[in-house]
Amino acid sequence: DKRLDADISPKPTIFLPSVAETNLHKTGTYLCLLEKFFPDVIRVYWKEKNGNTILDSQEGDTLKTKGTYMKFSWLTVPERAMGKEHSCIVKHENNKGGADQEIFFPSIKKVATTCWQDKNDVLQFQFTSTSAYYTYLLLLLKSVIYLAIISFSLLRRTSVCGNEKKS
């Protein structure tokens, strides 16, 4: 009952591991969310980039949402494999061109070292963001006080000048 011209192939959204997860647990979890596909029959598996071995992964149930379906799958990568790139392969009858959809995920170590050179960088970034927020609030408060003073001065001047008799 789907329109023939509608694109009902799986639409992927990817989520990469957090810096906290990779630093604290020495693992990283890639998440692939597939949405707005029809019919519900779909196969998802994971491989290392340019590899042939299917990796152990988990997936949620296929859920129906507004006439289409969604599913998510995730791969938890141990520390020894964080330097490798991975891909999520999606088999679905409505994939464009009839080929399997391959979604690439970058190396966790490459992303982590690119983002934060040092563990203190995260704290520095948080401190900088918080400082910027409070500076903005302070400037906003200053502007509101300045507006009140100028408005009061203008109103007072108008009332004083308005009572004078004109000749």
Swiss-Prot record:
<feature type="transmembrane region" description="Helical">
    <location>
        <begin position="135"/>
        <end position="155"/>
    </location>
</feature>
<feature type="topological domain" description="Cytoplasmic">
    <location>
        <begin position="156"/>
        <end position="167"/>
    </location>
</feature>
<keyword id="KW-1133">Transmembrane helix</keyword>
<protein>
    <recommendedName>
        <fullName>T-cell receptor gamma chain C region C10.5</fullName>
    </recommendedName>
</protein>
<feature type="region of interest" description="C region">
    <location>
        <begin position="1"/>
        <end position="134"/>
    </location>
</feature>
<keyword id="KW-0393">Immunoglobulin domain</keyword>
<dbReference type="InterPro" id="IPR007110">
    <property type="entry name" value="Ig-like_dom"/>
</dbReference>
<dbReference type="Pfam" id="PF07654">
    <property type="entry name" value="C1-set"/>
</dbReference>
<dbReference type="InterPro" id="IPR051117">
    <property type="entry name" value="TRG_var/const_region"/>
</dbReference>
<dbReference type="InterPro" id="IPR003597">
    <property type="entry name" value="Ig_C1-set"/>
</dbReference>
<dbReference type="InterPro" id="IPR036179">
    <property type="entry name" value="Ig-like_dom_sf"/>
</dbReference>
<keyword id="KW-0675">Receptor</keyword>
<keyword id="KW-0812">Transmembrane</keyword>
<dbReference type="GO" id="GO:0009897">
    <property type="term" value="C:external side of plasma membrane"/>
</dbReference>
<dbReference type="InterPro" id="IPR013783">
    <property type="entry name" value="Ig-like_fold"/>
</dbReference>
<keyword id="KW-0472">Membrane</keyword>
